[in-house]
Amino acid sequence: MERVDHLADERNKAEFNVDDMKIVWAGSRHAFDVSNRMSRLVANDPVFEKSKRAVMSRKELFKNTLRKSVHAWKLINELRLSDEEGLKLRSFMDQPGFLDLHWGMFVPAIKGQGTEQQQQKWLSLATKMQIIGCYAQTELGHGSNVQGLETTATFDPKTDQFIIHSPTQTSSKWWPGGLGKVSTHAVIYARLITNGKDHGVHGFIVQLRSLDDHSPLPGITVGDIGMKFGNGAYNSMDNGFLMFDHFRIPRDQMLMRLSKVTREGKYVASDVPRQLVYGTMVYVRQSIVSNASTALARAVCIATRYSAVRRQFGSHDGGIETQVINYKTQQNRLFPLLASAYAFRFVGEWLKWLYTDVTKRLEASDFATLPEAHACTAGLKSMTTSATSDGIEECRKLCGGHGYLWCSGLPELFAVYVPACTYEGDNVVLQLQVARFLMKTVSQLGSGKAPSGTTAYMGRAKHLLQCSSGVRNARDWLNPGMVLEAFEARALRMAVTCANNLSKFENQEQGFSELLADLVEAATAHCQLIVVSKFIAKVEGDIEGKGVKKQLKNLCYIYALYLLHKHLGDFLSTNSVTPEQASLANQQLRSLYSQVRPNAVALVDAFDYTDQYLGSVLGRYDGNVYPKLFEEALKDPLNDSVVPDGYREYIRPLIKQRFRSAKL
C-alpha cells in the first residue's frame, strides 16, 4: 500500500534546504552520517522495538532492557563500531539501562581518578564488559551535600585493607543506576579515615557481587529502590540501595591518582592537581546540555507535526477547519520551544569546545579558566534541563487531550527526562554555585583583574550600569548588538544589586541565605545571556546551505525576544528596556512567528529523527495520525476481549441487583 504523506504540503512550503539544516543541527557532515546510520540501524532491528513497554510488568521491562543492552553490546563488537558510533547506537536504543552508568560514570571515574596501574587493571576488564560497574555516591540522607556523606572507609594497617561500613540507615547508598540488580562492581564514595583522622570523601573500587553466580558478597546488602515516576520510563533501570557491614577491600582499590594511603597508613596527597577532577564534571555537564537539546527537539517535533495535522474551529460554512498551528496562541507556545531546541544545541557545541580547552589547560597545570568553566557548566546544566522538562510538558499540552496518551510519546519522554533536574546536581543548588561565582566576580571589579570568558561583559560595568537601550522601532530588535546589550545590562544590574544587598549584612553567609531567591534569579539571567550570546555568535558566523542562515536567525531572535517577554519584570525593574521597547519586542516577535510558520515542519524534519526513535503516533513523519491512534487503541490488552475480566464477579451482580420497594 502506497504511503501517503499528510504533511507534504507543509514540507513544500519550506524556504530552506532541509538536508543542509540537518548538517548544521548535527554539527558536521561526519556527525550527521554517524547519527543517521546508527538511528536507522536501531530502527530496522526488531530487538529494539519498544511499543509494548507500557503494558510490561516491572520484571518484564527490566529483562527486556537486559536483552536490548546485551544485543547493543554484541552489535558494537560484531560491526566493530567506533566509540562515537557505539555511543550513538546506545542513545537511539532509547531505554535507560545499566550500560548508561557503566560507560557514562564508572569508566570515566576510573580514567579520571585512577593511577596508570589502576586504569590498566580495571579498564581492561570494564571495556570488555567482563565486569559491570556503576557510580555510587548519593546516599539516602545526602545528595547535593557531598561532604556530608556518611559511609566510611577506615584503613586497617594490620591487614592492609580498608573497612567499608554504613554506620547509619541514612548512610546507605541510594539511587545509583545499575546498582540494584546488575552491577558487579562500583566506584563508591566514602569518608577516608586513617589513624583516627577523617580525610574527607574519596573514591574506592568495590566488588559487590560474585562473578560466578552474581550473588551479593558477604557484608553487602543490595537491592532495587522500587518503582519510579511513570509507567515504563526509568523503571527499566535498576536504581539501587547499598549497605556495607564492615566490608573489607585491598588498600590498592582506593582510587589513588590524587591522593593515596601508604602501607603504614599515612595519607599522602599526590602532585597531580586535584582540579583535574573538575574536567570530568565539565564533560558530564556538557553532555547533559547536549542531551537537553535532543530531548526538547523530540517533544517539539511531535507537537509541531501534530499541530500541522490537527484542525479545529475556523469554519463557518461547513468548509475545512483551521490548522491548530495557524493560531497565534499555539505559535506563541510552540515556536519559542523550537527556538530553544536549536539554542541548546549550539550552546552544547560551544561547551564541547570549552571542555576540550579546559582539558588542555589542566594538563598544562593552567587552572585560570577553571572556576569560570565550572560555574558556566553548572549554570547551563541547571537552566537547560529545567527549560527542557518544562518544555516537554508544554508540548504535551500543545497536543491537547491526545498528548496524554502513552502512544503520543510525550508522557514517557517527560518521565524519562525530568530526573535530569536533580541528577548530577540539583538545579537550584547549581544556580547558587553560579551566584557565588558572580558575587566574587563583581567584588573584583575595579581591582585591575579584568573578567574574562562568559563574564567579560562585566568588564564594561560602568557603561552597562548607565546605558539606555537604543531600540527605536521593532526592527531594531533584530540588531544583535542591541539585543546583547539589553541582556548584558539586565544580568549585570541584577548581579550588582545582589552584591550591594549582600554588603549590608555583617555576616556574608547569613546574607547569602536571606537573598537566595534573588541570587538564583541573577544566576539565571547570566546563564540566559550565555545562551543568547552563543546563539547570536552562531548565526553571525558562516553557515552554508540555501536559506539556512535566515531561518536560524529567525529562531535566534525568537529565543531572545521570548526570554525578554517572559522575564519582562527583570528587564523593566533594572531599566534595561522601557515599556515601549518591550512592546516593540512583542511586535517583532509576532512578525518572526509568521516567518517561521511555513518552515516549522521542515525545521523539525532537520532533527532527522526516525519514527521508531520518536515513538509517537502524533509525531509520525507522514502525519497519518488518526488511523494509527485507532490501531494503538486496539492493541491494548483490555481490548483482547469484548467482555472484560471481572464482569461476572462485579459488573453483572451490580446491574442485576434487586431493591425492595420501601414501605410508606
From Swiss-Prot:
Main location: other
Signal peptide: none
GO CC annotation terms, alphabetical: endoplasmic reticulum; peroxisome
Induction: Not induced by wounding.
Positions contributing to FAD binding: C399, G400, G401, H402, G403, Y404
A matching Pfam family: ACOX
TM helices/strands, residue ranges: none
Compartments in which it is found: Peroxisome
SUPFAM superfamilies for the chain: Acyl-CoA dehydrogenase C-terminal domain-like, Acyl-CoA dehydrogenase NM domain-like
Flavoprotein listed as a keyword: yes
Cofactor(s) listed in the protein's UniProt record: FAD
Coiled-coil region list: none
GO molecular function, one term: acyl-CoA oxidase activity
Alphabetical keyword list: FAD, Fatty acid metabolism, Flavoprotein, Lipid metabolism, Oxidoreductase, Peroxisome
Catalytic activity: a 2,3-saturated acyl-CoA + O2 = a (2E)-enoyl-CoA + H2O2
Family matches, as InterPro entries: ACOX_C_alpha1, Acyl-CoA_ox_N, Acyl-CoA_Oxase/DH_mid-dom_sf, Acyl-CoA_oxidase, Acyl-CoA_oxidase_C, AcylCo_DH-like_C, AcylCoA_DH/ox_N_sf, AcylCoA_DH/oxidase_NM_dom_sf
Protein EC: 1.3.3.6
GO terms classed as biological process: fatty acid beta-oxidation
Enzyme class: oxidoreductase
Family of the protein in this entry: Belongs to the acyl-CoA oxidase family.
Role this protein plays: Catalyzes the desaturation of acyl-CoAs to 2-trans-enoyl-CoAs.
Protein's name according to its UniProt entry: Putative peroxisomal acyl-coenzyme A oxidase 1.2
Encoding gene per record: ACX1.2
